[in-house]
A protein has these predicted regions:
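Glycosyltransferases that elongate glycans
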Residues: 1-467, 479-480, 490, 496-742
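Membrane-helix and juxtamembrane interface regions of eukaryotic multi-pass membrane proteins
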Residues: 471-478
Length: 742
């Protein structure tokens, strides 16, 4: 590695992975060889529907493997030097930070305030930082919690900076046992902080039990008789750094946009656009960082890390946003639910950084405001380009906001000292119908039209020709709590795959705009890979049923052991497993972690991906609409878990969801096929071979949690309704297979 220049704020390092490249190419050519074998079979034995299905599935696998190999072909890594940036404090640009929450029950306020507290304590001048909290649930409890958290922040932030505390989310900091570390003064201060935090927690818990929302008074009176989906806008400045003190507290603003039952609110994308407009009137910072309410700041230098890139002239001219990885603190041993995303964050996203840049993942990202206002990389400052009537059509009818947007597009930085003067104007831009006849959600701001608004927004930014960067600092920038069990991560995955498939068939598809946008070819392949992951369920299910059919109906679709061509599928299997294992070894994970993630990928494909495809088909037929579902946020601390609960943390759980029916059906079919095959009840001489048996056994092993769920009880067992439906479908499949032999 070359020694970095003394004046450089960052270094871009190209990572070499020759072994992985060789395996990728070998696997691809083996897939082509398998397809050639299928064509030879058709030539010698004639067209058979069994071979035709196998050929179509394997063609898809070859195509999808080419997309997959593209992801990690040219990985890069950025190394930043924030200490060098500290010499240029006066040059630091202002940053507006958005934190979004939607439901005080599914997303308890204590989680949100920990994220807010960790943000208020970052190493960045407080007079150039503003925190906006969007509450889509219009909860008096959330506002009260933020107001109480401010009192704690006044002693917490100085404590963190005085003692250089690394983890600045109180619930995580106080979960560590540090009783014997530090000076007596530090120990005294720490005990005082812990006691104050426990009191804060208790006040919030008491408020949750005692609030009578119809009779709120004082500062909470605005929340009286409000409903989450029917209320006027509520915007309150909880704290304003009026003196512009660098070592004080950043601005803290509460925002609850107006909602009306008859006006579409566009879920999180709509909330983000309201935050963009409100902040544009109050602070109008050129950079905006957004966080989910459960992703606290784990690295206090994180904004400095991003500015090391944005201060570079080339990056400032070509790059739209800096994305940080999503990491989790509740990492169970060997990742039993495959929800730590380590391979995605450490390998896939670094691979994308070597093309046009990573996708925008909805949290842990710093955007340039002018990019979200629609500016292209080769477009100069607007100057007199737009007339006033054009600007009103783009940004809406607020004169004050159009003025602030114009200043951004002209690269004029302003940072008003008094937020209260902007309060009246902010209510106008937070109304439910403000975006009517404007370009919000289409040409400017976060994009509408998909429940994965983050991916869509990032892709449209890339389509304009912008690039993005990916930073992986140590310690990780942000940490959250990964969902545990079975239904929650599967429902989250179903929502994502539904939104991705919606985008694929929309006018924003990377295929539909191939002739007109500025996506690089390999970046287009990346987005195709992402959008097609949901469709992957169909060929995988078809291919999973082929060995079972062969065992039941006494056919074969794989070469027999005595045939030399058996080497092709055998080598494919071995090299594919080896290629996957190398990724886990490279990221310091165990072989057991590879196995857990592999089987969870299979389970997700058969469960959530399939239901995502069905949901989109029903939407196309006009039978239903896709909806944005808020997932329950957890805030677990390992110190609170008992030994017995630790043993249950890695156990798979089930509910009444229909998504478990397909995979349970496939498991029953494999068990029935293996039983019929080994009992030898098929008519005539045995035709199926070792390949078909191996495939079925492999699927049973992959779906082992489902097999255990068939016999377990309670939440760890499959519901009787799921078992009955799956049994009926499995019986029907076996019956049709036996009928095909007659």
């Amino acid at each position: 590695m070359a020694k970095p220049n003394a004046l450089s704020l960052y270094q871009k390092v190209e990572l070499q992975r020759p072994l992985q490249r060789a395996l990728d190419v070998t696997i691809f050519f083996l897939l082509l060889a398998l397809l050639a074998y299928r064509l030879l079979l058709v030539r010698t034995h004639g067209l058979c529907w069994l071979y035709a299905i196998a050929f179509l599935c394997e063609s898809w696998f070859a195509f999808f493997w080419a997309l997959t190999a593209n992801l990690t072909w040219t990985p890069v890594q950025y190394q930043t030097y924030p200490q060098r940036l500290l010499k240029r404090v006066e040059e630091f640009p202002p940053v507006d930070v958005f934190i979004t929450t939607a439901d005080p029950v599914l997303e308890p306020p204590i989680i949100t305030i920990n994220t807010v507290l960790s943000l208020l304590a970052v190493e960045y001048p407080a007079n150039k930082l503003a925190c906006y909290v969007s509450d889509d649930g219009c909860s008096a409890l959330t506002y009260y919690s933020l107001s109480e958290a401010l009192k704690f922040a006044k002693i917490w932030v100085p404590f963190c900076k005085k003692y250089t505390v690394e983890v600045r989310a109180p619930f995580r900091y106080f979960s560590d046992n540090l009783s014997s570390a530090g000076s007596p003064e530090f120990q005294y201060e720490r005990r005082r902080m812990k006691h104050a935090y426990e009191e804060l927690n208790q006040r919030i818990e008491d408020a949750a039990k005692s609030f009578t929302f119809g009779n709120l008074v004082g500062d909470l009176a605005d929340f009286s008789n409000t409903k989450p989906r029917n209320h006027a806008p509520i915007i309150k400045v909880i704290w304003e750094n009026k003196e512009g003190i660098r070592d004080g507290l950043p601005h803290l603003v509460y925002v609850s946009r107006e909602k009306r039952p008859n006006i579409t609110h566009h879920n999180k994308a709509g909330a983000m656009n309201v935050l963009t407009r409100v902040s544009g009137l109050m602070t109008n910072a050129p950079y905006m960082m957004n966080l989910d309410c459960d992703m606290f700041v784990n690295n206090p230098d994180i904004i400095l890390q991003a500015m090391c890139l944005f201060k570079d002239p080339i990056i400032r001219r070509e790059f739209a946003f800096v994305q940080f990885p999503q990491c989790f603190y509740n990492d169970l041993q060997d990742d039993p639910f495959g929800n730590q995303w380590i391979i995605t964050m450490q390998l896939t996203m670094r691979g994308m950084a070597g093309i046009q840049g990573p996708a925008y993942m909805g949290t842990g990202c710093i955007h340039r405001r002018k990019v979200l206002y629609g500016q292209s990389p080769n477009e100069a400052n607007i100057n007199e380009k737009y007339y006033d009537d054009e600007l009103y059509k783009i940004f809406g009818n607020s004169k004050d906001f159009v003025t602030s947007a114009t200043r951004v597009l002209r690269s004029v930085e302003d940072y008003p000292n008094c937020l209260a003067d902007s309060t009246k104007a902010t209510h106008e831009v937070a109304t439910a119908d403000y975006e009517h006849n404007s370009c919000w959600g289409s040409k400017v701001g976060w994009q509408y039209g998909s429940i994965v608004e983050d991916i869509l927004t990032g892709m449209l930014i890339h389509k304009k020709g912008w690039k993005s960067a990916y930073l992986t600092p140590t310690p990780p920038a942000f940490l959250g709590c990964a969902p545990s069990g079975g239904p929650i991560p599967l429902n989250h995955h179903k929502r994502a795959t539904t939104g991705l498939l919606e985008t694929l068939i929309s006018r924003n598809s990377p295929i539909a705009t191939a002739l007109f946008d500025k996506l690089q070819f390999r970046q287009r392949m990346f987005y195709l890979w992402m959008y097609l992951t949901s469709v992957q369920a169909i060929p995988e299910i078809c291919y999973a049923l082929l060995p079972a059919f062969c065992l039941i109906a006494n056919f074969h679709f794989l070469p027999k052991v005595q045939e030399p061509v058996i080497c092709i599928p055998l080598l494919l299997f071995i090299l594919f497993v080896l290629r996957q294992m190398l990724g886990y070894i490279e990221t310091d994970q165990s072989i057991r972690a590879w196995w857990n993630n592999h089987r969870m990928d299979m389970i997700k494909s058969m469960c959530s991906c399939l239901l995502g495809v069905v949901a989109v088909l029903l939407k196309i037929l006009g039978l239903s609409e896709t909806t944005f579902e808020v997932t329950k946020k957890e805030s677990a601390s390992s110190s609170d878990d008992t030994e017995s609960s630790d043993r249950d943390l890695g156990r798979f759980t089930f509910d009444e969801s229909p998504m478990f029916v397909p995979i349970t059906t496939i498991m029953m079919i494999q068990l029935a096929a293996l039983s019929i095959g080994f009992l030898g009840t098929q008519p005539g001489r045995r035709e199926f071979g070792v390949g078909e048996v191996t495939c079925s056994v492999w699927l049973v092993l992959c779906f082992w949690p489902i097999l255990k769920g068939m016999f377990a009880k309670g939440s760890y067992g499959l519901p009787w309704s799921t078992l009955f439906k799956s049994s009926a479908l499995a019986f029907l499949f076996v019956y049709l297979c036996r009928m095909s032999t007659k």
